[in-house]
Amino acid sequence: QNAWPVDMLQPQDVYVCDHFELKQDGPSIGDNVGNAIYARSHNGIVYAGAVRDINGLNELDDFVSFVRYYDPSHHFSTSGPRLNSTMIGINIPIRIGKATVLPGDVVLGRDGGVLFIPPQLAEQVVKTSEITRLRDIFGHQRLREQKYTAGQIDARWSDSIERDFTGWLKENSGKLPVAKEQVDEIVKERTR
């Protein structure tokens, strides 16, 4: 039954599963199911449970996975041919950690963990995160230059730091890891 949702995956989907934190005798994703997920979605998984066959999964270069545990066991009970878990739904609201996840949510996985973003908020989240990223790059540069103290950068910025940031954006537009058009729009918003 763990293959049913895999068969429904489309390109760019992310397989997100609440497997109730099952560890021993819990894994239902190994290198076979992992290969099937990757073949259909060209993406990876967010899995609140254990996976197995780590070496085989690691052979999938672009198969990104966020999982709770690794265990070499299988989701069939060791005492007979019964499943230790049963699927209760596909494309339904679930919990991953403390987050409620709805079908269609945007999945953002980073080294520090995973975020689930409602699709209607995705554009706002991206724009806000780009501004935060630029502020961080600017702040780190100014800290290395010893122009400002950590206390000044970590606190609400003074008007002079805000003006310096706006000037820095203008000077570096086109050289930053955010598209020039977006940087120019940020500058335009800041200088109204």
Tell where the protein language model's regions lie, with residue ranges.
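Beta-strand-loop-alpha-helix segment that lines the small-molecule cofactor/substrate pocket
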Residues: 110
